[in-house]
């Protein structure tokens, strides 16, 4: 899975291609 998104609860999921602010970069 790639990309990213944030739920209204404040949790975020990050794909390998995600560069969204607030997401941890691994």
Swiss-Prot record:
The keyword Metal-binding applies. The lineage of its organism: Eukaryota, Fungi, Dikarya, Ascomycota, Pezizomycotina. Cu(+) 2 binds at residues 6, 23. It comes from Colletotrichum gloeosporioides. This is Metallothionein-like protein CAP3. Belongs to the metallothionein superfamily. Type 8 family. Cu(+) 6 binds at residues 14, 18. Cu(+) 5 binds at residues 12, 18. Keywords: Copper, Metal-binding, Metal-thiolate cluster. Cu(+) 1 binds at residues 4, 23. It comes from the Eukaryota. The keyword Ubl conjugation does not apply. Cu(+) 3 binds at residues 6, 20. Cu(+) 4 binds at residues 12, 20. The gene is CAP3. GO terms for molecular function: metal ion binding. The seven cysteines bind six copper (cuprous) ions.
């Amino acid at each position: 899975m790639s990309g990213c998104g944030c739920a209204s609860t404040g949790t975020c999921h990050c794909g390998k291609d995600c560069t969204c602010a607030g997401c941890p970069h691994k």
